[in-house]
Amino acid sequence: VTGVQTCALPILVIIISFNLPFLMEEYGLSSGRAGILISLFFLAIMAPGFVLNKIVQVLGRRIYMVCLLMIACGMGIILLSRSEILIALGCILNGLSYGIIQPLIYDKTSDVAVPHKVTLALAFVMAMNYVAILLCPFIVDAFQNLFHSHSQTFAFWLNLMVALMGMFIVMKQEKLSL
């Protein structure tokens, strides 16, 4: 797990809490209901913790590939749907994926860190996580300006593409196939 992966993961999914109300407004849906959908997203982040060992056991080496595919599918559902129910499904898929991968990053960090520096290593991972969340709107805005886009869908398309690229990179590194 690299620093880039640690930073990229929260940016991929946190866009839901930043941009979903604006996207729903652009779709002609109630932006006020976005709070409920964002709550479902955060609830879904927590849920895998109850069965994480079983998920890891079932998915094995494919876990990162599957989670990145779920993020891409969730973003796609959010983008293509004008239904709050389906947007909720997209939010849940993203939350579940993040809820699976994030603990694995912390676990891997504690495994690879020198024993007397584990706390420091975990602190760095946590700091990178929050720096990524802090920088997310600026990064997305920079890409939006670069591509001259003014649509609220841009951030979701960008993250869908990054998730797919990440999935293919993982597949190549792990020598996996769909």
Where in the sequence are the language-model features?
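A late C-terminal transmembrane helix in Major Facilitator Superfamily
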Residues: 110-148
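Structural signature of the two symmetry-related core transmembrane helices
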Residues: 62-77
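Helical-face signature of the major facilitator-like transporter fold
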Residues: 10, 83-95
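Intracellular juxtamembrane helix-capping segments at the cytosolic ends
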Residues: 100-113
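Helix-to-loop junctions at the C-terminal end of transmembrane segments
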Residues: 47-60, 144-145
